[in-house]
Amino acid sequence: MERVPNEHGRFGDFGGKFVPETLMLPLEEIEAELDKALADESFKQEYIRILQHYSGRPTPLTFAPNLTRQLGGAKMYLKREDLNHTGAHKINNAIGQALLAKRMGKKKLIAETGAGQHGVAAATVAAHFGMDCIVFMGEEDIKRQELNVFRMKLLGAEVVPVSSGNRTLKDATNEAIRYWVAHCDDHFYMIGSVVGPHPYPKMVREFQRIIGDEAKEQFLACEGKLPDVIVACVGGGSNAIGMFYPFLQDDVRLVGVEAAGKGIDTPYHAATITKGTKGVIHGAMTYLLQDEYGQIVEPYSISAGLDYPGVGPEHAYLASIGRVRYESVTDEEAVAAFRLLAQTEGIIPAIESAHAVAKAVELAQSMSPDETVLICLSGRGDKDVQTMMRHLGAKEGEDVAAIR
């Protein structure tokens, strides 16, 4: 495989910088500082130190014996990003970008958020580093994720509701970029996934690759070999790139799981790679959901973190060369996996992560007991319990058996 991105920020045909002239200089400044930071041993040491002593890394690799026994196929392992401080992988990237912002002398952070986990992570690091933070969030996601909205405000962030479009992640990102254009002198835009113009997809990958770096070392120590299959959910795709990147040169099957919503052949899904076509969104060439006139088709998923109409350009590239296989899982399949993991292992996953669990369960059942499947459990499901209660028809105070 060729080394990507190239000097123009391209991953094959994908990526690049499709932005207004006013953002070219800020992006060039970020790229220059990022390259210097990644080559600076003291920066890397400070990043690792904060991850260890503030976020709680390394996160464990957990064997799932009950799930394995019930499926009767491959051995199931979980990379526990749900055990990070703030409850998801998003903190890895937020710490890295906050350190870079601090290095650049920026005092204010801008973030967009869907499920709320990146917003919480941004608000958390802003509090930790003594910065201001403004988070843009779609009104629909605010309703779905009211606990995370309260957390952000509790941490001192300003949460700006976005009422345009479908009122979800795409629209929050649009507003965050507009705000950054007008305030780029003293604000740092902290993108939460491997999306956007160069150098953001590369930067977020570098701050998330610790997931796969740790998992590789842990798996070798545990099994004496690499996993046969690795599965991760894909919205923008940062947890998946973080997990996949260290394994790209290895003989390991990599499977990304998109949201099929109410069905891959209905209008209600967010399966960008499976159903999308090439186009530009949020400053990068990638696959996206669009109509014949190039207008964005609104995505749908039960998961606020997966209903994005684009995908990280590196994922688009990996799909185009066939290195990663991208499949999809419906709302109902994800909900079933959410309950399955909770009831077999006592682990409540984020509904985003449950999409990966669902696909891993399907794959494992056709594999032999001497084979292994590694799931990136990108976050915990506390934030989704109310959504699950509504979805399953259970009311507060009703017997828990009602949701079995």
UniProtKB/Swiss-Prot annotation:
Signal peptide: none annotated. It is an enzyme of class 4 (lyase). It comes from the Bacteria. Keywords: Amino-acid biosynthesis, Aromatic amino acid biosynthesis, Lyase, Pyridoxal phosphate, Tryptophan biosynthesis. SUPFAM superfamilies: Tryptophan synthase beta subunit-like PLP-dependent enzymes. The modification N6-(pyridoxal phosphate)lysine is found at residue 90. Tetramer of two alpha and two beta chains. The beta subunit is responsible for the synthesis of L-tryptophan from indole and L-serine. This is Tryptophan synthase beta chain. The lineage of its organism: Bacteria, Bacillati, Bacillota, Bacilli, Bacillales.
